[in-house]
Swiss-Prot record:
Name of the protein in question: Large ribosomal subunit protein uL29
CDD domains reported in the protein's UniProt record: Ribosomal_L29_HIP
Main location: cytoplasm
InterPro entries: Ribosomal_uL29, Ribosomal_uL29_CS, Ribosomal_uL29_euk, Ribosomal_uL29_sf
Pfam families linked: Ribosomal_L29
Gene Ontology CC terms: cytosolic large ribosomal subunit
GO molecular function terms attached to this record: mRNA binding; structural constituent of ribosome
Name of the gene encoding the protein in the UniProt record: RPL35
UniProt feature, compositional bias: Basic residues: 86-96
Location in or out of the cell: Cytoplasm
Known role: Component of the large ribosomal subunit. The ribosome is a large ribonucleoprotein complex responsible for the synthesis of proteins in the cell.
Disordered, as annotated region: 85-113
Assigned keywords, A-Z: Cytoplasm, Ribonucleoprotein, Ribosomal protein
Record organism: Gallus gallus (Chicken)
Amino acid sequence: MAKIKARDLRGKKKEELLKQLDDLKVELSQLRVAKVTGGAASKLSKIRVVRKSIARVLTVINQTQKENLRKFYKGKKYKPLDLRPKKTRAMRRRLNKHEENLKTKKQQRKERLYPVRKYAIKA
């Protein structure tokens, strides 16, 4: 089997990807048997290509699955932890923009009664 490109895999359905994954795993097991029995050098070098192809197929499956989950949870109040933006612990606990701008009644009254003085300078 030739080297598989990820862009070719992205257009396929999940069933096709799973079938291709099974085929690649079967091929890998056959190549490993050939390695033990003393197979040709071409078969031995093919093991690496097949392993990388399996990784590509699994990557595409996982990425599409995560993308679908993102679409499903878009606009919902709660999201799974792995779909939330990755930030530091301190950044997650920080006040949001709205909470930072809130003022107490006392503070609002003080600002209203004693506004900032503006001075005009005579040239």
